[in-house]
C-alpha cells in the first residue's frame, strides 16, 4: 500500500472515522481536509445492499445535478443529416459518423461523453471493445442513445452525471469541486442520493443504502449519516 503524504496524515486526523457526520458537516470537513493545490473534485460514494450479479439488481442511470460538476464535458455525437445539425446547434464539440469511428479505432479520445442516435448504433457498436472499458459506450439507460440529441447535449452540458453499481455494490459519483459553495455541494449530494433511492430494485433485500462517504480528490473519506441525505 502506498505511503500517505504528511499533509494527508494531518488532514485525516480531523476526521473521526468512528462517526457519521451530517451531509453539511461532511462537506465542511472535505474542504478542511483537502490537500490538493488545484480545484479538486468532490466525489460521493455509496455502498448499496444489492447483488450486482443478478440482472434485476443492476443499477445504472444518469441524473442532472442542480449545480453541475464544475467540469466542462466535451461531447461527441454520432448522427447524420438533421440530427447532426441539431447536435452542432446544441453545442456538441464533435459531430459525425464513420470518420469519428475511424479516429477512435486509431486511438483518438479527446472527448468525455458519447451520444448516438439509435440508427447509428449498428456502426457505433463496432467500438464496444474500445469504448466499453472506458465507460464511454452510449446506452439508452443513461439517455445517450436517443434521437433527441438537443436534450441529450443540453443535459450533459448542464451537469448530467452517469452512475453505475460496481461488482461490490458501490457507486461513485462526482458532485462538484471544492471551490463550490457548501450548500451547492450538499444539494448535489442529496440529489444523487434521492435518485439512487428511487432506483432501488424491487428484489433488493435488507438495508438498501448501507453507507455513504464523501471526499476530495486527494483527501480522506468522510462518512455521512445517510438519514441527513433525505
Curated annotation (Swiss-Prot):
Xref: Pfam families: Ribosomal_L1 (PF00687)
InterPro entries on file: Ribosom_uL1_bac-type (IPR005878), Ribosomal_uL1 (IPR002143), Ribosomal_uL1-like (IPR023674), Ribosomal_uL1/biogenesis (IPR028364), Ribosomal_uL1_3-a/b-sand (IPR016095), Ribosomal_uL1_CS (IPR023673)
One GO MF term attached to the UniProt entry: rRNA binding
Alphabetical list of SUPFAM superfamilies matching this protein: Ribosomal protein L1
GO CC terms in record: large ribosomal subunit
Keywords recorded for this protein, A-Z: Repressor, Ribonucleoprotein, Ribosomal protein, RNA-binding, rRNA-binding, Translation regulation, tRNA-binding
PROSITE patterns membership: RIBOSOMAL_L1
Gene Ontology terms: biological process: regulation of translation; translation
Assembly: Part of the 50S ribosomal subunit.
NCBIfam families given in the database record: rplA_bact
Family in the record: Belongs to the universal ribosomal protein uL1 family.
Biological function: Binds directly to 23S rRNA. The L1 stalk is quite mobile in the ribosome, and is involved in E site tRNA release. Protein L1 is also a translational repressor protein, it controls the translation of the L11 operon by binding to its mRNA.
Name the record gives this protein: Large ribosomal subunit protein uL1
Originating species: Bacillus mycoides (strain KBAB4) (Bacillus weihenstephanensis)
